[in-house]
Amino acid sequence: MHIVITGGSGYLAGRIIEKILNSTDHEISVISQKKSSFFINPRVKHSSWNESDKINNTVSSADVILHTAGFNAPESSKNPDKAVDFARKSTKRIIKAMKPSGNSNLIFFSTAHIYKSPLIGEINEDTIPENNHPYALSNLVGESLVENFNMSTNNKGLILRIGNCFGLPANESSNCWDLVINGMCKSAIVNKKINVSGPSNQVRNFVPMKTFLQKLQLVIENESVGKSSHILNIAYMKSFALSEIAELIQTRCSELFNFMPKINYEKPKDNLINLNYQSKYIQTLNKEDDHFLEEIDEMLTSLHQNCHD
């Protein structure tokens, strides 16, 4: 199988490439403006966004295209017009380059945050998006192009609306430490303190990276998953308040390293409704596949080792 991954130097793409290299013999092509340590692997072929002919040849020969490229939330806030423009142009380029035979699958990486801010209440794939944050809007622009693509061709485009992934980056230069759980883990080890910047009772759906990768593998290998809707929510089986996450990390530090980082709550509690973020079309992984604590422990252990090397 030939898998093309856009945004290959990014956080999600890095872990995806690592997983494919370690567990399959699939051919990998990456489209990315930035370089990554993965690109020295002979199994990984690299193209930059300014190499149009190379991109066209790469995408047209693909079995699966994972379109992960895009501005993250902070970048989108700083440059909203550029975020939307990149989402539109990059998605159009990928769609235009896909082979006309209709045998390739396009998987567009979107976000749970397109629904609302903050995420509250019952949310599934039928929920109408209403968030007007630049990050949400740029993702919705890409989604609309994929939906039009599905209506006008025999190709198969699938949209993944992904919860808040967390876990170690595969690439040390990956910009992932501003993510909530990643940032809490790093601060707990480096500063012996956990800062909770949002209301402590705000509830979010956090997805362990290993759980995300398992669900992505299921989507890639089983074309029927999500076929009826062309949209899939990627969710963890339970959502947690920020205070619960902070206390969990505090407890893991005590058990693993025999110290208790202080928790600093920066905002008062808010009158927030609970969150049930779920998918109607992809099964929740069984409890034996639960990687929540495993992902946190691996991140804490790696950070602790780096601080003491």
Give the predicted meaning of each segment:
Residues 117, 132-158, 163, 189:
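Active-site Tyr-X1-5-Lys
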Residues 140, 153, 165-182, 192, ...:
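Glycine/proline-rich active-site loop of Rossmann-fold NAD(P)-dependent oxidoreductases
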Residues 241-242, 264-281, 290-291:
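Active-site loop of classical SDR/Rossmann-like NAD(P)-dependent oxidoreductases
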